[in-house]
């Protein structure tokens, strides 16, 4: 009997000793705040962590899951513009402003940032409370929640010191959350900052290849060469991501590719985007401002309707709009009414030319001190010396009418957006990487890698044609098939029904309700056709092209949407030692 009790005691002691030396798994939440061009939105992720004695804690990258997207709140550009309206005075975009004097109003900028950040915090807490079980809540609160707030093209071209100052304030607000809910949010200057266009594209590239399981440490991808050196091939796919204010093109290069000396490729390991243990890859990553859905719409109207070929007697004939559709001559946001008329929002901030017109100001040092930047603005019919209202105005134009001529639409999209004579304004970053326009990307560099196109507008264009059986359900990027389908769709006429306006397709292919989301869909189709033609004209062509919103897991459920959000998490957590120092050694306790 004593021997039995002795063995029980030994076993109990051994169990406790094993607990001291074995690894422990727990869950950690991540908050990625997408400060995009139109709004700011929280994305809450959950991942499994493993803590091992003497090795620290690391994240299992395959466990990262989006648990919910948050609500849309005020964009950072609005926060900055409202602060400038108040302290620089109305119409600051049209006159000289002494930026140095505005430093005295930094406390007021801090106050202005508090409200949107409070709303984001409350929204995030509501998601965590509703989506986590009790055990997960305990673990998430104990580990703290890394927060990564990144701005993309929405404030990328915002001049002076205002943007960077705002980010100092945002980091302070994140690091000082309300104590009431018990969640400990924390961040640092590496995680919360404006990201460049190239970074946005590279993070989207990492997201795509991680979720589709092309990116990893798979031994099957590696071999030992004749010199005893480990060589790993990559099976990576490229991505074309089109947002609201910019478009990113990223693809891997074949081994041995020779590029012009002016073109800069990015090595994922050398630039510390991925650790050395991952297969090495050189990629092209370029981002173009003014090629997002909203920004390109404003610039396209400004240029098209300033051209005498399309502007006659105050009427601009737009080949990218349906026959029977008309609107007032403005780049403001359009609402299609039930009676078929189009109401254009006259609010300056709702004008899709506003960001570009703000940039193209003689009061912006990027314009006043750099002649080439001023030339680019003037090439696009924007005179930097004029007041903001005039920079946004389309001269001598009162009405825009659709003509539904898709071939002419493609030619204008090509000449205005894809292959302009001069680089589109605010594209210093793209030019510095060796590309002044989209057509140059595939002329100077190309790849046989698969290409995935993502972005709401691009997906809507393809899915609309599939819905009307104008494209095959398995459409894989044949440019002439797409051009023929779009040509038929865009020749449709707007008809007013009792329940509202519809697009009446030719050849008895049915009807589709006309609304504020699809009235200018043909411009997006034309952009897609132009893009595919340039891909096909390159020295190498993609093995296939697909349009995707998200990547599904083995259970068929989406793992996460494509975009840069998962990529920015991976970029940080895969460097385990650095991540351990920032997230666990310092962590939220750094701010105590």
Curated annotation (Swiss-Prot):
**One Gene Ontology cellular component annotation?**
membrane
Q: Which InterPro entries match?
A: GDA1_CD39_NTPase (IPR000407), NTPase_alveloata (IPR017227)
Record key words, sorted = Hydrolase
Q: What is its EC number?
A: 3.6.1.15
Enzyme class, UniProt record, top EC level: hydrolase
> Its catalytic activity?
a ribonucleoside 5'-triphosphate + H2O = a ribonucleoside 5'-diphosphate + phosphate + H(+)
Quote the PANTHER family the UniProt record gives: ADENOSINE/GUANOSINE DIPHOSPHATASE, GUANOSINE-DIPHOSPHATASE
Q: What is this protein called?
A: Putative nucleoside-triphosphatase
Q: What is the species listed in this Swiss-Prot or TrEMBL entry? A: Toxoplasma gondii
């Amino acid at each position: 009997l004593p021997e039995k009790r002795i063995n029980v005691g030994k076993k109990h002691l051994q169990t406790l000793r094993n607990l001291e030396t074995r690894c422990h798994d727990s869950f950690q939440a991540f908050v990625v705040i997408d400060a995009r061009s139109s709004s700011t939105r929280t994305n809450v992720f959950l991942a499994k962590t493993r803590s091992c004695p003497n090795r620290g804690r690391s994240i299992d990258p395959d466990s990262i899951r989006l648990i919910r997207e948050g609500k849309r709140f005020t964009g950072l550009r609005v926060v900055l513009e409202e602060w400038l309206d108040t302290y620089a005075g109305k119409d600051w975009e049209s006159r000289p402003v002494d930026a140095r004097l505005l430093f005295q109003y930094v406390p007021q900028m801090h106050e202005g940032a508090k409200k949107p950040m409070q709303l984001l915090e409350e929204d995030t807490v509501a998601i965590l409370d509703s989506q986590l079980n009790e055990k997960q809540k305990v673990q998430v609160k104990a580990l703290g929640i890394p927060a990564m707030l990144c701005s993309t093209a929405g404030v990328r071209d915002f001049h002076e010191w205002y943007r960077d100052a705002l980010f100092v304030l945002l980091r302070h607000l994140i690091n000082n959350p309300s104590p009431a809910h018990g969640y400990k949010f924390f961040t640092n200057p590496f995680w919360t900052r404006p990201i460049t266009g190239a970074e946005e594209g590279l993070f989207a590239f990492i997201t795509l290849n991680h979720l589709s399981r092309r990116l990893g440490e798979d031994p099957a991808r590696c071999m030992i060469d004749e010199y005893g050196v480990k060589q790993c091939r990559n099976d990576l796919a490229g991505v074309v991501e089109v947002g609201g204010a910019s478009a990113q093109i990223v693809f891997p290069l074949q081994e041995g590719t020779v590029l012009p000396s002016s073109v800069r490729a990015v090595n994922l390991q050398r630039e510390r985007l991925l650790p050395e243990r991952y297969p090495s890859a050189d990629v092209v990553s370029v981002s173009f401002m003014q090629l997002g859905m909203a920004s390109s719409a404003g610039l396209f109207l400004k240029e098209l309707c300033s051209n005498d070929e399309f502007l006659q007697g105050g009427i601009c004939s737009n080949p990218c709009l349906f026959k029977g559709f008309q609107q007032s001559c403005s780049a403001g946001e359009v609402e299609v009414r039930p009676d078929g008329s189009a109401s254009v929002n006259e609010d300056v901030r709702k004008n899709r030319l506003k960001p570009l017109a703000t940039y193209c100001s003689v009061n912006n040092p990027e314009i006043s001190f750099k002649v080439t930047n001023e030339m680019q603005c003037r090439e696009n019919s924007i005179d930097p010396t004029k007041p903001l209202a005039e920079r946004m105005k389309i001269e001598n134009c009162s009405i825009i009418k659709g003509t539904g001529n898709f071939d002419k639409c493609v030619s204008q999209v090509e000449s205005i957006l894809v292959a302009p004579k001069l680089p589109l304004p605010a594209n210093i970053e793209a030019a510095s990487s060796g590309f002044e326009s989209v057509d140059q990307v595939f002329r100077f560099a190309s790849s046989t890698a698969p290409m995935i196109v993502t972005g709401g507008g691009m997906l809507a264009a393809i899915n609309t044609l599939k819905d009307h059986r104008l494209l095959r359900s398995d459409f894989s990027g044949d440019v002439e098939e797409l051009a023929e389908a779009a040509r038929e769709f865009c020749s449709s006429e707007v008809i007013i029904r009792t329940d509202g306006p519809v697009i009446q397709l030719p050849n008895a292919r049915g009807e589709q309700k006309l609304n504020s989301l699809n009235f200018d869909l043909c411009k997006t189709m034309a952009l897609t056709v132009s893009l595919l033609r340039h891909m096909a004209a390159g020295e190498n062509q993609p093995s296939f092209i697909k349009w995707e919103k998200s990547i599904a897991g083995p259970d068929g459920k989406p793992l996460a949407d494509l975009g840069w959000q998962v990529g920015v998490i991976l970029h940080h957590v895969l460097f385990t030692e650095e991540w351990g120092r920032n997230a666990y050694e310092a962590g939220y306790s750094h701010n105590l």
